[in-house]
Amino acid sequence: MTSFVNVWDRASNGGKNMIPRILLLSLFLLACTTVAHSEEVKLGRLNIAYASATPRTAYLWIAKENRLFEKYGLNVNLVSIRGSATTMQTLVGGDIDVIYVTGAAAITAAGRGAPVVIIATSGHNDYKMLAHPSIASLQQLKGKTIGISNPAGSDYFALRRMLPKLGLIPGKDVSFLTTGIQSSIEKVLLVLEGRIHATLGSSDTVALYELKGQKLSVLADAVENGVYVTSGDIVAKRQFLKENPAKLKAFLKAMIEGMWMAKRNQAVFGAVLRKYLKIEDMRLVDVMHKNNALDYPSKPYPSEESIKQAIEDINAANPELKLNDREFTDTALLKEIEKEGFFTTIQR
């Protein structure tokens, strides 16, 4: 610092002009502070996995492709792992730091002793009851078979809650067939092949088949019947959250900015769909943008209603777990982010 001041003194005629000297000294100190801050925000590596590649996952891809993770000081390794159970195992085992899975998967794992917690969400799943075109009404589903991914999947729990509201009793009026298939697009293929009669799917699934000229019977809507299922929640181990709050806070900021970038810019959204899902049809991109990007929550707090229903459903299927007295979410970081005004800033 002394040499810098001496150099400036010689250039300012013996120090007679103090205002430029003070100004330049202030700029120098600001530069030092900026460099120090940029070093501080280099938070290191974060390993993130998602259980299924769908249009709802776009915000993670957008954050990756547009260097939003780097913007907040993170070097992110983003990987796809097929299936919620396997993805959860990688988190619990320590190979992955953060995962994107259904809330039901996280709650079930926590109920069985896994030290995991939900810290954010991407919103609700817009489940529809999809049937073969020959089935025109709910009454025609009686005696038929509905395909599910597995007996612990979010579609299974949604159906058990939804069917009685539609006048159908599981096990009596309809039966379930475990397909082992997570993708609703693939399950609908089983419907069209006549191997099952109906399944749950999304608005995206309906649009995809209709654009191919294949009609489906949409018999009911889950949300319209008061059934709320998260499309995907952000989950971390409690110990990792405790030891790495700065990393997770930076991740959440990148995630939130990715969501808002998707909302505002359909071209950015479409670019990641082309890269990760091989979707080229702009008509489908337009539908998926409306169904997913525009549906991202403005503040991604875990959905209390979805979690409440998931707990009730899991307890009904696994009464030994007794989940009611447990805490499955931690919103401390999101509350910090909101208190700092980040939501307001990013939405401008």
Cite the ranges covered by each PLM segment.
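Sec/Tat signal peptide C-region and signal peptidase I cleavage site
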Residues: 34-38
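Bacterial N-terminal signal peptides
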Residues: 22-32
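Pocket-lining segment of extracytoplasmic ligand-binding domains
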Residues: 103-105, 176-177, 183-277
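Short, glycine-/small- and polar/acidic-enriched structural segments
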Residues: 39-183, 187-193, 197-203, 218-222, ...
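Secondary-structure end/capping motifs
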Residues: 242-323
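Conserved C-terminal helix/tail region of periplasmic/extracytoplasmic solute-binding proteins
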Residues: 311-348
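Bacterial N-terminal signal peptides that target proteins for export
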Residues: 11-24
